[in-house]
């Protein structure tokens, strides 16, 4: 293949003597001759051409490396563009995988968090109500002293139980929300305190609240000289307390039975799946054993 010769281009190159970059024209014959000379010389010594051969490097269209926008890339940019960007000293440290919980453990995490939130709200409301009742009630000289002692004891127990539940919920809940649904969550080892907070807030605290209402009725109606109204209101609160206990038992029983039923259904489904798989394996092994015989 002959070398292309353009007289006008040659004259233009001669006039541009101030160019710092040397321009060359390379043909296929030059490259073949250079390769032949290099093979004859044994591949060692000085460079085979008096001029540098052009080198081209592929660079993928990625901004992760050091590539330029004009499409002309360097070897260094093409290599670094395929790598992950390096983190600087000021970047945040990647903590990696912290151990995500499975579905059953995630359910326990969500349940514990919901229990703590409900306990904190209920305990704060009822404890504040009991303190307001104790302060705002007006006591007379005619109020029986044993009734005042009962009121003070019930109010102290009510506030103490709800404050304990509030303290446990406010101490555990922030750490649960900070760690998230991972194995670092404290609800796994602090399950006893979560259940205790739920028991204080919903069961014992609500029963003491009903007793508190009955004692307040006695104090108010005795102050006006009409204790019969206190007897009537207390008689109305007794069936309410019984219904409260019965409903709590029924709800707990139905919840446990539902959980056990779901567990039994999952076990039966898994057993059927394993039986079907075992039957399929037997059916595939039977013809081979017959052929061997």
From Swiss-Prot:
Q: Which residues lie on this side of the membrane: Cytoplasmic?
A: 1-122, 168-198, 252-293
**What stretches pass through the bilayer?**
123-141, 147-167, 199-219, 231-251
The way it spans or sits in the membrane comes to: Multi-pass membrane protein
What this protein is reported to do is described as: Ca(2+) release-activated Ca(2+)-like (CRAC-like) channel subunit which mediates Ca(2+) influx and increase in Ca(2+)-selective current by synergy with the Ca(2+) sensor, stim-1. Required for Ca(2+) and IP3-dependent contractile activity of sheath cells and the spermatheca. Affects brood size and somatic cell function.
Q: What family is this? A: Belongs to the Orai family.
Q: Which Gene3D superfamilies match?
A: Calcium release-activated calcium channel protein Orai
Q: Keywords of this protein's UniProt record, alphabetized?
A: Membrane, Transmembrane, Transmembrane helix
Query: What's a single GO BP term from this record?
Result: store-operated calcium entry
Report residue spans for region: Disordered: 62-81
Is the keyword Membrane assigned to this protein? yes
Keyword Nuclease found: no
Protein name, as recorded = Protein orai
The Gene Ontology CC terms held by the record are: apical plasma membrane; basolateral plasma membrane; membrane; plasma membrane; voltage-gated calcium channel complex
Q: Which gene encodes it?
A: orai-1
Q: Where is it expressed, tissue-wise?
A: Expressed in gonad sheath cells, hypodermis, intestine and spermatheca. Coexpressed with stim-1.
Q: Which Pfam families match?
A: Orai-1
Organism, per UniProt? Caenorhabditis elegans
Q: What happens when the gene is disrupted?
A: Worms exhibit an inhibition of intestinal Ca(2+) release activated Ca(2+) channel activity but has no effect on the initiation of posterior body wall muscle contraction, intestinal Ca(2+) oscillations or intestinal ER Ca(2+) store homeostasis. Attenuation also affects sterility and brood size.
Where it sits in the cell: the answer is: Membrane
The stretches that face the Extracellular side, renumbered to this chain, are 142-146, 220-230
Q: Which InterPro entries match?
A: CRAC_channel, Orai_sf
Q: Name one GO molecular function term.
A: store-operated calcium channel activity
């Amino acid at each position: 293949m002959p070398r292309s010769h353009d007289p006008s281009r040659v004259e233009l190159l001669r006039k541009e003597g101030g160019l710092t970059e040397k321009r060359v024209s390379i043909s296929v014959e030059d490259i073949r001759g250079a390769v032949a000379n290099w093979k004859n010389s044994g591949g060692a010594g000085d460079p085979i051409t008096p001029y540098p051969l052009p080198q081209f490097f592929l660079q993928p269209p990625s901004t992760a490396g050091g590539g330029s926008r004009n499409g002309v890339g360097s070897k260094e940019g093409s290599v670094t563009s395929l790598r992950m960007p390096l983190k600087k000293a000021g970047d945040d440290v990647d903590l990696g995988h912290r151990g995500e919980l499975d579905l059953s453990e995630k359910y326990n995490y969500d349940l514990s968090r919901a229990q703590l939130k409900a306990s904190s709200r209920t305990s704060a409301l009822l404890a504040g109500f009991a303190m307001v009742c104790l302060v705002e009630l007006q006591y007379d000289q005619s109020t029986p002293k044993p009734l005042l002692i009962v009121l003070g004891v019930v109010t102290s127990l009510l506030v103490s139980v709800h404050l304990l539940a509030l303290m446990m919920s406010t101490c555990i809940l922030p750490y649960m929300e900070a760690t998230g649904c991972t194995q670092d969550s404290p609800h796994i080892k602090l399950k006893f305190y979560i259940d205790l907070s739920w028991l204080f807030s919903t069961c014992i605290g609500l029963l003491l609240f009903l007793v508190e209402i009955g004692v307040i009725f006695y104090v108010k109606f005795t102050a006006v000289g009409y204790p019969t109204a206190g007897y009537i209101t207390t008689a109305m609160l007794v069936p309410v307390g019984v219904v409260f206990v019965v409903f709590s038992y029924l709800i707990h029983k139905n919840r446990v039975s539902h959980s056990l039923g779901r567990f039994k259904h999952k076990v039966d489904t898994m057993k059927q799946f394993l039986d079907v798989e075992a039957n399929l394996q037997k059916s595939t092994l039977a013809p081979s054993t017959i052929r061997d015989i």
